Amino acid sequence: MTIKAVVFDAYGTLYDVQSVAAVTDEAFPGYGELISQIWRLKQLEYTWLRSLMGRYEDFSVITRESLVFTLKALGLAFDTAVFERIMEKYVHLDLYPDAKTALAGLKDCKLAILSNGSTDMLNALVRNTGLDTILDATISIDSTKIFKPSP
């Protein structure tokens, strides 16, 4: 059997979600790593809970809500400019160092991302990191309105 297509998750598979720590540490010195870890845990928690409750929200909304929760839980005051600068990093996440090499090794296959990310977030991220020239498709769960994994 010949493999014709390979589908990857985006966040945590091709893209290092912890790469936001540099931006969060710049905004809140000494808190960067902690912010990025709590933020990611809240994102996952919110997607799971929303799926179970049948109350879908776009992943960009979840990402914003998760960051607000994180900053407030840590008692960190923030203004709109700081908040938006941190949020912007989510469409400029770092690729894992071996991601492009791994994808290049699969050049005979159709390649795609299937992700909880919103269509707009994923398209911007893929474009900003140059994967738009490598991937054949970027698939968001937006159309199903339920986050993975889904029972």
Where are these regions (language model features)?
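Short, glycine/charged-enriched secondary-structure capping and boundary segments
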Residues: 20-23, 126-130
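Substrate-recognition element of Asp-dependent hydrolases with the DxDx(T/V) motif
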Residues: 80-92, 99-127, 137-143
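Conserved Lys-Pro-Asp/Glu-containing loop-to-beta segment of HAD-superfamily phosphomonoesterases
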Residues: 146-151
